[in-house]
């Protein structure tokens, strides 16, 4: 069975460190991931970006740009998730951060907080496929535009 999942994510890099969240549920549990997530009904891409980024990091986005789209296939034991990811570079004010809520309006927050992680320390052992795709992009890998298939994905 293949499940399509579309998510919108914010990328913030400062001093070669990536603003990450740590997932507490789902296929990327206990891995570093990008802040972001799924659209709500009638929500535009940038509205989702702003809402999800604030919910998961506490930071408000001052500006965004460089929209791009990638995809990966994550094969778990009984299903395959086709994860379509929309990336935006974001600018935030580090001086203003709201408290991150455990419980959101209609769901639980699936993030255990934020972490600034050196890009060189992010790899397949500790990161989601989204971060791995971002690293591929940042290294100017020409294959970044092609799909990646993760067979027998391990949930930590």
Label the model's feature ranges.
Residues 1-18, 64, 85-89:
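Conserved N-terminal beta-strand and adjoining loop/helix that marks the start
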Residues 27, 105-156:
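Nudix hydrolase/Nudix homology domain
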Residues 39-62, 72-127:
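Unchanged
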Residues 4-6, 28-30, 82:
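Exposed loop/turn and edge beta-strand positions of beta-sandwich/beta-sheet ligand-binding modules
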Residues 4, 11, 32, 59, ...:
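Residues that recognize and position ribonucleotide moieties
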Residues 66-69:
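Residue-level recognition of beta-strand microenvironments
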Residues 21, 98-102, 147-148:
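Short, hydrophobic secondary-structure boundary micro-motifs
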Residues 17-55, 151-156:
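Conserved Nudix-box catalytic region and its N-terminal flanking loop in Nudix hydrolases
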